[in-house]
Swiss-Prot record:
This is Haloacid dehalogenase-like hydrolase domain-containing protein 3. PANTHER family: HALOACID DEHALOGENASE-LIKE HYDROLASE DOMAIN-CONTAINING PROTEIN 3, PTHR46191. NCBIfam families: DREG-2, HAD-SF-IA-v1, HAD-SF-IA-v3. InterPro entries: HAD-like_hydrolase_domain, HAD-like_sf, HAD-SF_hydro_IA, HAD-SF_hydro_IA_REG-2-like, HAD-SF_hydro_IA_REG-2-like_cap, HAD_sf. Pfam families: Hydrolase. GO terms for cellular component: nucleus. CDD domains: HAD_dREG-2_like. The lineage of its organism: Eukaryota, Metazoa, Chordata, Craniata, Vertebrata. The gene is hdhd3. Belongs to the HAD-like hydrolase superfamily.
Length: 244
């Protein structure tokens, strides 16, 4: 194939939270004199996130919500489920946590991510982002010194649909003016990244640090990488084959 575009997922593909969410919520609550177990907060967060994603998909855009309000509600529900009712203290805490997760301080590069992006740049490949993140992503990428690698960023909020909806991939391909068979998508989610990209006609690779994924999914072993930098030899091979 002739390769012209690489699109990347972000969370747990290029960036990951520096400290588990429950620990971060606990630390902020402790500053305000609230006593709650970090493990309880972690479980409550997962339940609140899952519930809000089901009731108000894609940050509640169809229901007229903003992504900021969606996240504030998730935080409030997390503390309710942990036995702490709403108060001015929790409202203030929620706003602080929303702001904290907007900054590079709470995020770390996935090992091998920058090396992979540098290598793709050196290979002359265009790159973009397709992510289910919200409107904070571009600023976060800027703070993490990653924005320079990408021609554009497509988020679920800006596209109006979230992965695995094919519309978000079509939007990226349209912006790049590249046909799907000349594009590769890389991400850590089997359904949202690997399968959805292939359904639209793109090539895709799954980042899966644990082995063996073939026991879980029907996926060729050569389509699985354990870190972003493992993508590069595969791309080099594709580029060499396209020139012969």
């Amino acid at each position: 194939m002739s390769l012209r575009l690489i699109t990347w997922d972000v969370k747990d593909t290029l960036l990951r939270v520096r400290v588990p969410v429950g620990q971060q919520y606990y630390a902020e609550a402790k500053k305000r004199g609230l006593c709650v177990n970090p493990g309880t907060l972690e479980t409550s967060f997962r339940n609140a996130y899952r519930s809000h994603s089901r009731l108000f998909p894609n940050y509640g855009l169809a229901q007229g919500m903003s992504s900021r309000q969606w996240w504030l509600d998730v935080v409030l529900q997390t503390f309710r489920l942990s036995g702490i009712e709403d108060s001015d203290t929790v409202q203030s805490l929620a706003k602080q946590l929303y702001q904290d997760f907007s900054t590079a301080h709470n995020w770390a590069l996935v090992p091998g991510a920058r090396e992979a992006l540098d290598s793709c740049t050196n290979l002359g490949l265009r790159m973009a982002v397709i992510s289910n993140f919200d409107r904070r992503l571009e600023e976060l990428l800027r703070q993490c010194c990653l924005e320079r690698y990408f021609d554009f960023v497509v988020t679920a909020e800006s596209a109006g649909v979230a992965k695995p909806h094919l519309g978000i991939f079509h939007k990226a391909l349209s912006l790049a003016k590249v046909p799907p068979h000349q594009a590769v998508h890389v991400g850590d989610d089997y359904v949202n990244d690997y399968c959805a990209a292939r359904m639209v006609g793109m090539h895709s690779y799954l980042i899966h640090p644990k082995t063996p994924p073939k026991l879980q999914w029907n996926i060729p072993e050569e389509h699985v990488i354990q870190s972003p930098e493992q993508l590069i030899p595969k791309l080099v091979g594709v580029l060499k084959n396209s020139m012969t």
